[in-house]
């Protein structure tokens, strides 16, 4: 079970809604993933329509919605988007995203921390997308964020856990859930994140652009379950030396 703020989730896999060929394929993939928390960009939701092609099927699927502020370039823009989301969707939950450079989509640490502090004070449950910076993640935790979401690699890059060393420090020192977000490209990346101690992963592009998104979503579900089970099972420690799994000389001595 995963506890974040006032909610509990059975699944440790969070999913996104972008890049799918259709809303039907999006919903089928989310169901196959077992995900219970789904993020969506407010800039893609038509708040004037009651039958929005993205929002309506998500509500029907019964998942918890995590609106995000993707597209915001400053703290002020993110705070404005957060209030729109709360009014439109009736939720205090928010994935805080501030990335001023459209080419790299890297989160702005200064603006993110500034916005997070304000939004927490205004009653939001803030889950900030941030760089894999242990100092920043600790500061975000200290201002009241319900979880931290450090990147594994740039958004949509499918590079995997390129920031592994920093992620390990973040996980070790965190007292709130750590969700590895961005860059996860294949199920094995997700399994590795859970094995190393992450509480969850958020996957979007790797599922949405797959030749078979539904089966890829299922593969990610199984990988996350395997990674979590492996960690809970207590894997053996790494060694620079070989260790025999059976006696090497006993049978020779017995036959002498």
Swiss-Prot record:
Pathway terms, separated by semicolons: Cofactor biosynthesis; thiamine diphosphate biosynthesis
Key word Chaperone present: no
Uppermost EC category: transferase
Record-listed 1-deoxy-D-xylulose 5-phosphate binding positions: 156, 182-183, 204-205
UniProt name for this protein: Thiazole synthase
UniProt keyword terms in alphabetical order: Cytoplasm, Schiff base, Thiamine biosynthesis, Transferase
Subunit-structure text: Homotetramer. Forms heterodimers with either ThiH or ThiS.
GO biological process assignments: thiamine diphosphate biosynthetic process
Gene3D superfamilies cross-referenced by the UniProt entry: Aldolase class I
Subcellular location: Cytoplasm
Main location: cytoplasm
Task of the protein: Catalyzes the rearrangement of 1-deoxy-D-xylulose 5-phosphate (DXP) to produce the thiazole phosphate moiety of thiamine. Sulfur is provided by the thiocarboxylate moiety of the carrier protein ThiS. In vitro, sulfur can be provided by H(2)S.
GO molecular function terms noted in the UniProt entry: thiazole synthase activity
């Amino acid at each position: 079970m995963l506890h974040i703020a006032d909610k509990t989730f059975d699944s440790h896999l969070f999913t996104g809604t972008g890049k799918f060929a259709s809303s039907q394929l999006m919903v089928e993939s989310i169901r196959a993933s077992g995900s219970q928390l789904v993020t969506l960009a407010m800039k893609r939701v038509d708040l004037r329509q009651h039958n929005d092609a993205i929002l309506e099927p998500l509500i029907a699927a019964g998942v918890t919605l995590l609106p995000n502020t993707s597209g915001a370039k400053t703290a002020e823009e993110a705070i404005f988007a957060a209030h729109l989301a709360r009014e439109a969707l009736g939720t205090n939950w928010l994935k805080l995203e501030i990335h001023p450079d459209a080419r790299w989509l890297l989160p702005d640490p200064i603006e993110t921390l500034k916005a997070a502090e304000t939004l927490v004070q205004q009653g939001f449950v803030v889950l900030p997308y941030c760089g894999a910076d242990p100092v920043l993640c600790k500061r975000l935790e200290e201002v009241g964020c319900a979880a931290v979401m450090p990147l594994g690699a740039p958004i949509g890059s499918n590079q995997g856990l390129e920031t592994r060393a920093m992620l390990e420090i973040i996980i070790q020192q965190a007292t709130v859930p750590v969700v590895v977000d961005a860059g996860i490209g294949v199920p094995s990346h997700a399994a590795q994140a859970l094995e190393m101690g992450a509480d969850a992963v958020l996957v979007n592009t790797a599922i949405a652009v797959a030749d078979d998104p539904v089966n890829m979503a299922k593969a990610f579900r199984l990988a996350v379950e395997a990674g979590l089970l492996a960690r809970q099972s207590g894997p053996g420690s790494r060694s620079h030396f070989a260790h025999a799994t059976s006696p090497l000389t006993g049978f020779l001595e017995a036959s002498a």
